[in-house]
């Protein structure tokens, strides 16, 4: 399992966003050298030696994009830190696709799988722990529905 540098320090920005007051770092234990290189290529801040992904201070996120009707089962706060790391990865992957760094939709799917796997590892590393059934439900949801977010042409707020 990976590890986060700290708890999430963010300020609410109505109507649905949060702004990070401090950088959020996630050190992955499963990211391969090839995956690190792919992420660096598309603009994700990840160290080449320790596989630490950094989300900078000031980053704007919606935490987890969970429909309110599902909050009784998976509230956005259950997987918030993992979701923030996932958000920035999707944003950078989308940007790299638009700039031609990622050349095909099939290649973008490879990057999306890496981001989704980091989301799962982040939930597995969370303190307090996220129950396994919630991890699996959230992971399956991003695998099933994340393609719409990553294929979106709408700009994210980011930094």
What do these predicted ranges mean?
Residues 1-159:
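Extended terminal accessory/targeting regions
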């Amino acid at each position: 399992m990976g590890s986060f540098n700290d708890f999430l320090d963010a300020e609410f920005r109505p109507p649905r966003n949060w702004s990070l007051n401090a950088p959020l770092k996630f050190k992955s234990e499963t990211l391969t050298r090839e995956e690190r290189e792919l992420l660096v290529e598309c603009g994700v801040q990840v160290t080449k030696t320790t596989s630490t992904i950094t989300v900078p201070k000031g980053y704007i996120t919606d935490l987890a994009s969970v429909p309110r009707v599902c909050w009784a089962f998976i509230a956005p706060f259950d997987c918030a830190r993992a979701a923030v790391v996932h958000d920035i990865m999707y944003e950078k992957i989308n940007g790299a696709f638009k700039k031609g760094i990622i050349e095909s939709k099939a290649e973008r799917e490879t990057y999306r799988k890496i981001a989704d796997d980091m989301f799962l590892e982040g939930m597995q590393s969370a303190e307090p722990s996220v129950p396994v059934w919630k991890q699996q439900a959230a992971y399956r949801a991003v695998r099933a529905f994340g393609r719409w977010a990553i294929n979106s042409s709408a700009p994210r707020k980011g930094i």
